[in-house]
Structure formats: structure tokens, C-alpha cells
Amino acid sequence: MSFNKKNINKLFYCFIVIHLILWSLAPSLTNNNLPLDTIEALAWGGNLDWGFNKHPPASAFFAEIFYQVFGNNDWAYYLLSQIFLVFSFFIIFKLSQEIYKNKVFGFLSVVILEGIYFYNYTTPEFNVYISELPFWTLTVYYAYKANFRNNAKDWAMLGVFSAIGFLSHYLFSYLLLSITFFFIYIFIKNKKFNFKSLIAFEIFIIALIPHLIWLVENNYITITYGLHRADSGLNDKDLIDHIIYPLSFLLKQIGILIPFWIMLFMLVSKFKFKLNFKDTKFIFLIFINFLPIILI
């Protein structure tokens, strides 16, 4: 497959601008009301605190910023969601170039992601999942740079974006655990602890202190809410439901990913490449892509 590499940047930026306009405009013209999660974030934003009963505060904070600028114009919150998404695409584009040293692969990485249901159809709803996306990609990006360049600035940025991601959604912790396991693997492999990694850890903890204080003062309400939701089906009398529902969920996810797999197969088949299982870059990708799923 041949691309004009000089124009790949233009192609990428055209792609994300089209995505931004399309997925901001379509719901603005067709929806009578904002999605429930977006309304909830706006309600929380009107009374900002360091946490809320369901989630940590970041999504409410970002929604409130847009409310202060755009007021109650619905289109603004569809735009907010798409800004978060296309910025995530931009970071993925940058990370792919860092890893593969090839802008074409960076662009194709984003195109393949566009084929996933959760990166197109569901994105107009600004919620905690959209809120964490740019910080998920930024955390991965700076974890990569911190490991391979060992620059104090990169470690600091890793700590900052890890904290904001965690303050968007607690499930962000699965990514943080995966990155931590990767660093442990590297330290063991090199037989040397990297003290610069403490920069990220210290910044992460300091940034979380206000939220942790709020959490204690409010009887850990965000955590108990999540545990209650997870525990709500354990007392069901029909045990077969504990098999049927997970299988149903799995089949739905497989169905949703069909366009992704088709695109992946069509694109990958055009390139010749060889996997090096000992390559640290490849191992990094395994840790940050698959370990969070396994941990969940």
C-alpha cells in the first residue's frame, strides 16, 4: 500500500476535522435533549466539589467550563465530547509515530479506531468515559516517553495526566496498574530501580489529596456506590443469569467489533511486518492494551 508521506499530516487533520464536524453537527440537529450523563455532569458542575456520589469530579469540571462559555446551547456539549475524542486521536497519532517511526502507521491506527462503535456512535454523549479518553492516551504517551527517554519532565507529565485520568473515572486505575507492572518488569529486567519514576508517583499522590480528603469526609460514597452497583445482581435467585448475561454481553461486543476486525484485516494484509516478542516497545504495547482488559 502506497501513501504520499508528505501529505499524511494533511490527510490526518482532514480526517479528524471531518469527524469533529460530523459527530458534533449530527446530534445537534437530531436530538431534542442532551444525553442523560451529559445533563448529570452539568448538574454536578453547577455545584462543583472534589467528588460526587457516582464519580470523581473531572467530567463535571470540564462540563462546567463549557457552560460558563457557551451557556445552555446543546451543540456546545456535543462539541466538547468530540474535542476530547479528536485530541485522543491526535495523541495516538503522535504515539504511533514514536513507536513505528512511520506517519502512515499513525494515521492507520486512528482510522482503525474510528471503526469501533465506541469511537463514533456513542461519542456525542459527554460522560466519564469520554472525559478520561485524552488522559488515557496522554498517560500512555508519557509512560512510553518516560521509559524510553527517562526525562524528568516526561515523568512529571505522567504523574499529572495519571491523576486527571483517575479523577475522571476510577476504572482508570486498571491502566495505571498495567503501566506500573510494565515498569516493575523493566526494573527487574535492568536490575535497577529508576528513582525518576518517583516523580510521577509523588505528583500523582499530591494531585489526589483534595479528592481523597473529600472521599473520607463523605464516607467513601463514590466507592460504596460502585460496590453497590457491582453487588446488585449477586442475590439473584436464578444462577443461570450469571452465565447468560455475561455471554450476551460478550456476543454483543464481538458484534460491535466486526467493522473493526474487517478494517484491521484489510489494512494489515497490505503490509509486511514481523513481530519481535523481545522488543521492549512490543512488550509495552502488550501491557497497556491487554493487561487492563485482563485485570477488569
Where are these regions (language model features)?
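Extracytoplasmic catalytic/substrate-binding loops of multi-pass membrane glycan-assembly enzymes
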Residues: 26-41, 51-65, 71-76, 219
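Membrane-interface transmembrane helices that cradle and orient dolichyl/undecaprenyl
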Residues: 97-100, 139-154, 165
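Transmembrane alpha-helices of multi-pass, membrane-embedded glycan-processing enzymes
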Residues: 63-67, 80-91, 112, 132-135, ...
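Membrane-interface alpha helices of multi-pass inner-membrane proteins
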Residues: 47, 154-170, 204-208
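Short acidic/glycine- and proline-prone juxtamembrane loop motifs at membrane-interface regions
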Residues: 121-131
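Transmembrane-lumen/periplasm boundary regions of multi-pass, lipid-linked membrane glycan transferases
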Residues: 175-278
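Short helix- or helix-capping micro-motifs
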Residues: 16, 106-114, 162, 166
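Transmembrane-helix motifs of polytopic, lipid-linked glycan transferases
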Residues: 9, 79-100, 115, 137-142
